[in-house]
A protein has these predicted regions:
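N-terminal glycine-rich phosphate/pyrophosphate-binding loop and immediately adjacent elements
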Residues: 2-132, 136-138, 143-147, 151-154
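Active-site/ligand-binding neighborhood in enzyme catalytic cores
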Residues: 122, 157-213
Length: 213
């Protein structure tokens, strides 16, 4: 006789939020089921960043009309390089209330959009939480402060690994668990040299990429 497994928590989606939530709950001893609509990505098959346009049937743009009318801001994301990753709105429309307008770039895969972001991971600073009272008087202040979130920044960065960002700069707090930054590239060195002549300080961008094991 088949038995049914009972879970304490069901997490829908394995992206940045769902993945961390599932991991945190499971390590606390809860029985967690993580549901994911997508498949496991195989980097050597699914990423074609270095494939030149002339090797695609339609120079990377896709067959005319293939993707339907893409929402503004999404037209540069979905093409022959990426259509095996992203959900095509024309084929699988976003579920909305009648009359509502909303778009979101979706990627159905284990790990979600953590697979396709640039990994720049600077912290919000104190001013970002208080635009009205501490900046220009516009907008509304958040009901929380940077100090409220700081312990969670520390925990998250220690978990996922953060390179660079170990030095604070105006309204950009330092990462306390930062790994060494990657070596600067040629263009970055030129910018750093020019900034130094102007008396401007440059720091490495915090990246969620491991610079050492």
């Amino acid at each position: 006789m088949a038995t049914q497994t009972i879970y304490d928590v069901i997490v829908v989606g394995s992206g940045a939020s769902g993945g961390v939530a599932a991991y945190t709950l499971a390590t606390k001893g809860l029985k967690v089921l993580c549901l994911e609509a997508g498949r496991m990505i195989e980097p050597h098959k699914d990423f074609h960043n270095h494939k030149p346009p002339y090797r695609w049937p339609y120079r990377g743009h896709g067959k005319p009309g293939q993707y339907g009318k893409l929402p503004q801001g999404m037209e540069w994301k979905i093409n022959e390089w990426t259509d095996q990753l992203f959900t095509i709105p024309h084929d699988d429309p976003y579920a909305l209330a009648p009359g509502a307008k909303f778009t979101w770039t979706r990627l159905r895969a284990v790990g979600g959009r953590t697979l396709v972001w640039g990994r720049e991971s600077g912290r919000f600073g104190p001013l970002d939480f208080k635009p009205k009272s501490m900046q220009d008087g516009f907008g509304e202040d958040w009901p929380i402060t940077y100090e409220d979130l700081e312990p969670y920044y520390d925990k998250t960065e220690a978990l996922i690994g953060m390179s660079g960002g170990g030095e604070a700069v105006y309204n950009s707090p330092a990462s306390k668990n930062a790994l060494p930054a990657f070596n600067a590239r040629c263009g970055e060195l030129l910018i750093k040299k020019g900034a130094a002549k102007l008396g401007l300080k440059t720091v490495s961008m915090p990246l969620a990429v491991l610079s050492k094991p």
